[in-house]
Amino acid sequence: MKAPAVPDWSAKLARTGWWHSMELPGESIEGVRSVAEMRESLARFPVPEDLRGMRVLDIGAWDGWFTFEMERRGARATAVDCWDNPRFRYARERLGSGAEYVVADVYELSPERLGRFDLVLFFGVLYHLKHPLLALERVCALATEAVFVESWVTGGKPGGRPAMEFYEAGELGGQTDNWTGPNTACLLAFCRGAGFARVELRAVKDSRAHAACYRRWPPPEAGAGPAPELLKVAHNTGGGLNFSSRRDEYVSCWFRPAGAGLSRENVQPEVGGFGSRPLYVGRKEGGAWQANFKLPPGLTPGWHEVRVRAGGSAASNALRIAVDLAAEPGDLAIAGLADGVAWTPGALSGDVLALWVRGLPENADCANVRVRLAGRELAVEYIAPPGDEARQVNARLPGPVPPGGYEVTVAAGRAEAAAMVSVCRS
């Protein structure tokens, strides 16, 4: 498919050397984009005039007009680009700017490297990327409130079918650094899929789409309905409460709402205050509902509260999950063991072994607790929640074990405990 025609800026860029026009002390620089055009583009987003006390990140800063405008409004501004632009450094010096300048690829960006920002500008970058969705996930992780995205689009209606063109060798405007051309629906879907709670199309003009992407749900309206009861939260595939921010992981939660008629459009889960759009919402037996959603990008290591709102309700009670937490047990000890069906103390006659273990870490789950019998790994199927001094752990044998006495070990992190069990039959 032939890409839509794009203006040829090459002659003007070659003549001026600047992409952004600049008003510097005692000097006006004419770039490809006029100051009026950039002000018009920025005005399509709800950027406050007063940004004092806020950190703002400008990704794809180029010559820096948007960076310096954020600083002019009072923000602590940081600019990022994939190459060291001498024109940015020149303008920063002339303006006496204190903006930080970071040369890095968008895929290298992380909260650990840059910190977190109230607002992120992501203008004119997406179509230069081979992996636009991955980039949006990286950008989402950096923002605590909002990311404003401006990108080339191939057209299409916002509610149409998402589609994207791939430009292998300069098909878009003759530039070999233009790789992708999403249509408007695809751009919005990318933003939602990257982990933003809300995505709002602000404008489409001259094949440029402007999307405001928010990390949080709006606050409940006055007179919001009764809060649902959050029953359980677990890893979508592992079933435990431990999650890794370095992976593309998903959360399942079960809740009991006060009303009915729920869908993906009116269920609002959140983790650590960051909203995440449900990928699945369905009713289960007994009046409970289940929602599956992406773990929000950029969570700090530690415990995070999960809540859910449903059908315009207030927020539910909170349950906690662990993100990037190592299992750090106390002094592990096996306080008792028994057959998991017959409950014969000290003996195993079936396929399930029940143990009572002291010293397990609070974030112990089936993924980070290991049980072995005679050196063979058992499948951990259940761990009792924290509360009792000794927590029950159920593990299933992988196959037949001859009668006799065997050593059983339980390990969490670098700690391990052992006991003996008598296998009567298998």
Feature locations, PLM:
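N-terminal, positively charged/glycine-rich alpha-helical extensions of SAM-dependent methyltransferases
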Residues: M1-G26
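Conserved class I S-adenosyl-L-methionine
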Residues: M54-W62
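Immunoglobulin-like IPT/TIG beta-sandwich domains and homologous Ig-like subdomains
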Residues: N242-A318, A347-M420, C424-R425
